[in-house]
């Protein structure tokens, strides 16, 4: 995975979930917050991050910084994905299918946020297995990293793009 410099990108961030986490100690309970954030430029770059802190804004800030370190490049064909793929992480699986232009994003929750910030306008998805936000996000990112354009597949097979499409 190649590093993508976030300073040259106009990134937006979206908070997917904020969890209240407690640690029980001898003196009582210690309260902290865990945040999951997705960042993207709506032009083929997207990443996610997690952060924990004693205050919500600090947890979100840490998550955004983490997300900027984990950016990936998403191949696009027009407004949709190049091909169908299943992303996996843990017990979570996400099926991502290209859709006809104008059909919109048929996805729920975390998958929708990832697709919107990646700049994918037309896609259909189905979440299979674990529906936990972090597992769904990681499975979606896994699916997007498995995406290959027709040019990349033709290069791997040492054939031309025209013969691949026939």
Curated annotation (Swiss-Prot):
Record bears the keyword Membrane: no
Which residues belong to any copy of the S5 DRBM domain? 11-74
* A GO cellular-component term linked to this record: small ribosomal subunit
This entry's Gene Ontology molecular function terms read:
rRNA binding; structural constituent of ribosome
Identify the Pfam families for this entry: Ribosomal_S5, Ribosomal_S5_C
A single GO BP term for this record reads:
translation
| InterPro entries documented for this protein | Ribosomal_Su5_D2-typ_SF, Ribosomal_uS5, Ribosomal_uS5_bac-type, Ribosomal_uS5_C, Ribosomal_uS5_N, Ribosomal_uS5_N_CS, Ribsml_uS5_D2-typ_fold_subgr
Which keywords describe this protein according to UniProt? Ribonucleoprotein, Ribosomal protein, RNA-binding, rRNA-binding
The record comments on the domains as follows: The N-terminal domain interacts with the head of the 30S subunit; the C-terminal domain interacts with the body and contacts protein S4. The interaction surface between S4 and S5 is involved in control of translational fidelity.
Q: What does this protein do?
A: With S4 and S12 plays an important role in translational accuracy. Located at the back of the 30S subunit body where it stabilizes the conformation of the head with respect to the body.
Which HAMAP family does the annotation name? Ribosomal_uS5_B
Task: Provide the protein name.
Answer: Small ribosomal subunit protein uS5
